[in-house]
Amino acid sequence: MSYAYLFKYIIIGDTGVGKSCLLLQFTDKRFQPVHDLTIGVEFGARMITIDNKPIKLQIWDTAGQESFRSITRSYYRGAAGALLVYDITRRETFNHLASWLEDARQHANANMTIMLIGNKCDLAHRRAVSTEEGEQFAKEHGLIFMEASAKTAQNVEEAFIKTAATIYKKIQDGVFDVSNESYGIKVGYGGIPGPSGGRDGSTSQGGGCCG
Amino acid sequence: MSMEASELQDLSDDADYAASQQQGSASMMRSDSGKRSSPSEHEDAELIYLKDNVAIHPTQFASERISGRLKLTKQDSVLFLSWIPYKGQTSNAKLSEKDRSLYTITAVPFTEVRSIRRHTPTLGWQYVIVVLSSGLAFPPLYFYNGGVREFLAIVKQHVFLARSSEDPNVFIVNDFQSPLQRTLSSLELPSSLPVASGQSVYPLDGGSSNENQGRTSADIGNRVSSVIQSGLRKHKNHDPTRDLSIHLLEKFSLVTKFARDTTTQLFSENNGFGSVDKRWNNQPVHSYPEKLSNIAEEKHNEIRHSYSENDLLKDEEISNDIDVPADPLEFNNISLVWGKPRQPPMGHKEFTALLDSEGRVVESKALRERVFYGGIEHQLRREVWPFLLGYYAYDSTYAEREYLRSVKRMEYATLKQQWQSISPEQAKRFTKYRERKGLIDKDVVRTDRAFEYYEGDDNLHVNSMRDILLTYSFYNFDLGYCQGMSDYLSPILFVMEDESESFWCFVALMERLGPNFNRDQNGMHTQLFALSKLVELLDTPLHNYFKQNDCLNYFFCFRWILIQFKREFEYEKTMQLWEVMWTHYLSEHFHLYVCVAVLKRCRSKIMGEQMDFDTLLKFINELSGHIDLDSTVRDAEALCICAGENGAASIPPGTPPSLPLDDGTLYPQEDDVL
């Protein structure tokens, strides 16, 4: 399928916060509580529409365990957006946000759009991090913030799309040189013609994952 | 001392632990480090610093060190680091010239250095670890006469050094911008590295270059240029040996053996293998050892073993306008050597025939060979895996094994009791335990739950898995628990069907593969480095491609190596592959040859589609479930034979899954390092 733009996303955060479930909810619209833990990285993709333009999101779902950080860091390269996820029922996953953010700031493009997601908001009775704390952290660090639930799908669609909309706006505002793929954006057919406007290698090799 | 750092998740966070691991596994080198033109050998390079008696420990024994001279030189305002081993002063006969040249660091520019980690313990030798932008690192450089501080001070005079905020012993190189805008070059993103275009590059072992090699390279260089000028892709048409190589069909059956006997020798005789391409990165062309061409010609008429079962690995989609460099081990699309056809799995009768009357394995090699070529019938795995994993000794009798099992059962119960006896009150004050238990609880319910044996709520096998992993994290508290371990344990428990037996088999496996789970990922980096060396040896054009496309860190093979292809094959196939690898029949590092085999199968697609790192990673990920096991194992066997001694020499000593040389302790004592 052709797209105007392709955005590379990366999903980061502690192990078990629901990164893979968020991805699956977004790409397949289903919640699968039983799935294998992520080793290395997994990929997902979906087409969305912003401003009447088809945009393909290529999403990298990373392993969360501390030991794999040195590998995970190599995945940040060329990401246009990041979903930084914590689990509202586990305080420590919130406490580790600063270190994830530090990684992202160090290894990703400075213009990368970061969405902070407090996941598992369906488990409000076990809440260990208040919404205000999430908001406050996001504000302090210039992130977009949402609480979401991969289980009920609440705000999942919104989180991915709002991130894309922010990136799209940055393109409109000329923040990115879209011909430079290190920003995590590829211009496809129908996108703003740039020096490399014809470059659309991913449509043919994307495999079956963009359904 | 680390216990007070409550933020840290695991005891293996300890820098000391990491360091001790790093020492033990002989660590890494940058594969292309030796191939740059060496400014230190030029007249105009300015010598900045020279330090004698700086050594590398290829094994965990300091007595087996390789001593050499560390130098900093400067040319065109770029600082270079080199370390050259002394000639003929190896302290141990086990270490050959080859080892020494393997470790040589030839003029690495600091633009490619990401960080320097220093270790200046009060006891023992000081050392530094130089980490490159690619994420790879050189093995620790031990300063036998001290002077790490002085070394760093001098480096600091010439490049920008900034102390890492995370670790005061780590100095980030070229970290000259604000934290938000650090240059790619100072981090792990090699994309911004300067490319030494137009420079001649030399083979890694150029440090020990001899006249013969120089001549060979020159000859080949001439031939290459003429081929390139004529625009021919299949340079083999120029190979005069081609016309001589019509051979009789009856020789076909000898090809494999012939190749086995000759390739190693050929490869070492003809150093031109691989060295040619490095001069012509965009148009790699190869010189073929004469006899190999003959083999290829013979095979031309042979029925090719069919492995192109799935489309993912087929080459046909490659557009014609991209000139994919030919595979040096192929001739007219027919691989030069190939492995034996797979045999049916070994059954009970056959196994029993390999035992003496009291149950000893008469000849372990015969058993390992049999398993290597055919695997094991499932019902028999429970009896054979403990041998392969090293839990049972091959020369043990039935009675001895029975006794071992009962002793180990009690020992397991004792170990398990250690965490089972932790009261809720005690757990409150035991963060490390709670964290580990929490992680394990979360992960066992995310391991192979689609597989019948582990599916459903309150599955007893899942509980066993949790108990084994938690017990292991007490048995080996330093290593603890890391994701990926449950992937190894799952088939073991499924095969052994007994908690204690599974635990001890897992323990035996972790003796070899524990370094995969080191917090600093050193065991992984060592293997990825060895893989890069093997690809360089067995498919230089592909190696060059990875080099040009910033893929030399081989992170795209991370999952393959971390859990030995567990996620790439279906359950039964994974068990087949594991038992083949665990025989260590042709090589302890057979899994790396499996990696090469798969990569070579995809080489045309990778290069033809000009995959960058991201695309390649995604592509490799999506191979999962699409790799044919039997043909891959055959390819890997052929590659392993083909690489011969040169292959073995490409893999640094101590690379997992090699057992630690010191049988006494699983992990080197801290005192060795501190």
Swiss-Prot record, chain A:
Family to which this protein belongs: Belongs to the small GTPase superfamily. Rab family.
One GO CC term on file: plasma membrane
Q: Does the keyword Membrane apply?
A: yes
The places in or outside the cell where this protein is found are: Cell membrane
Supply the PROSITE patterns for this chain: RAB
Q: Where is this motif: Effector region?
A: 35-43
Q: Which GO terms describe its molecular function?
A: GTP binding; GTPase activity
PANTHER family registered for this protein in UniProt? DRAB11-RELATED (PTHR47979)
Q: Which InterPro entries match?
A: P-loop_NTPase, Rab_GTPases_membrane_traffic, Small_GTP-bd, Small_GTPase
Q: Which domain of life is it from?
A: Eukaryota
Query: Organism classification, top ranks?
Result: Eukaryota, Viridiplantae, Streptophyta, Embryophyta, Tracheophyta
Q: What is its main location?
A: membrane
The protein's name in its UniProt record: Ras-related protein RABB1c
Q: Which Pfam families match?
A: Ras
Q: Name one GO biological process term.
A: endoplasmic reticulum to Golgi vesicle-mediated transport
Q: Which residues carry this modification: N-acetylserine?
A: S2
CDD domains referenced in this protein's UniProt entry, alphabetically: Rab2 (cd01866)
Q: Where is the lipid attached (S-geranylgeranyl cysteine)?
A: C209, C210
Protein function: Intracellular vesicle trafficking and protein transport.
Q: Which keywords does UniProt give here?
A: Acetylation, Cell membrane, GTP-binding, Lipoprotein, Membrane, Nucleotide-binding, Prenylation, Protein transport, Transport
Q: At which positions is GTP bound? A: 13-21, 61-65, 119-122, 149-151
Topology relative to the lipid bilayer, per the entry, is:
Lipid-anchor
NCBIfam families, alphabetized: small_GTP
